[in-house]
Amino acid sequence: DLINAIADRYSLNKNKIILGNGSDELISIIAQAFLEPENEAIHTEYGFLQFPQAISITGAKAVVAKDINFTVSVDNILGRINKKTKLIFLANPNNPTGTYIPKEEVIRLHTSIPSNVILVYDAAYSEYIKNDSYIDGSELVNKFKNVIMLRTFSKLHGLASLRLGWG
């Protein structure tokens, strides 16, 4: 079945994989599961538009971390974290800018956030990055409890109308 194939392909625990009606649905489910109106969630300035939309539906505050030259700034994300922060949404590689932050910066981000803050790592376009400095998120999900990785079949496999995402 599909979940077993995903688990085998990405070396993930099949019991931690969920399928959804595209990444959009999974982003909304995550926001609704973890956010209350008194919470905050961080997203990047030029990130995926579904992030602030999903946050706002919950009544939580969407906090923007400014990019630098259209590239995610880990320092700016870290500077926006406070006691109300519950989620950080990060698209890497980023849509719509096409930029990505290297593995070292992703690891620095994750090791610098409080353990009660969840990093939602949207790697929808990961197959397009052919560089050893990139991390697709599988390693983070296998190592840490506060990371959720999102992927989709729509982009790489030409299945946009199918709306099939997983996390």
What are these regions (language model features)?
Residues L2-I3, I27, F51, V74, ...:
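A general structural signal for well-ordered alpha-helical segments in protein cores
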